Amino acid sequence: AARALKTNRTYNLGVLYEDPQHSGLGHEYFSRILESFRAQAEACGYDVTFINRNVGKRRSSYLEHCRYRGVDGVCVVCVNFLDPQVLELVQSELPVVTVDHMFNNRTSIVSDNVKGVQTLVNHVFGMGHRNIAFIHGERTAVTESRCASFYKTCYDLGLQVPDAYVREGAYHDCD
């Protein structure tokens, strides 16, 4: 408490994590990011609080919850980035870091989706495969960049990509 008074910090970081598939902390990709975030935060003397739309039994916005908890900043992971409450939080005075989504004037941690798909297709091609299919997630900016990279890499390798080879699927299915 004395340190918080002296530094004007709470040493509490918020995490906004909502997984549409309800896989919780078992999500293969985001669980690793969150564990790394938690470990680094703790190593720096911070606590981590999950942010949601409830403060006790009262509904609140994400920003209200962050203010209620007095977080020094918030990491936004795996949410609908177009949700008005997420936009309110991102546009607030709080420091915000987003994962796999970019906002102007905010820090983002993003995957190199173009290079990742390019590496994957080149690897499969190098193993002798010539009929390569691609299953992508719901239409988002991340999906668009992955699809564009898939088509471009296949084109560069001289591969034909029939429409039937590209399909939408769930990123993660709990069942």
Residue ranges and their predicted role:
Residues 2-62, 72, 151:
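Amphipathic helical "hinge" segments at domain boundaries
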Residues 26-29, 85, 143-146:
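Residues at alpha-helix caps and immediate loop-helix transition turns in enzyme cores, especially N-
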Residues 59-115:
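Short beta-strand-centered segments that line the small-molecule binding cleft or hinge
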Residues 16, 51, 77, 134-135:
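Short hydrophobic segments within beta-strands
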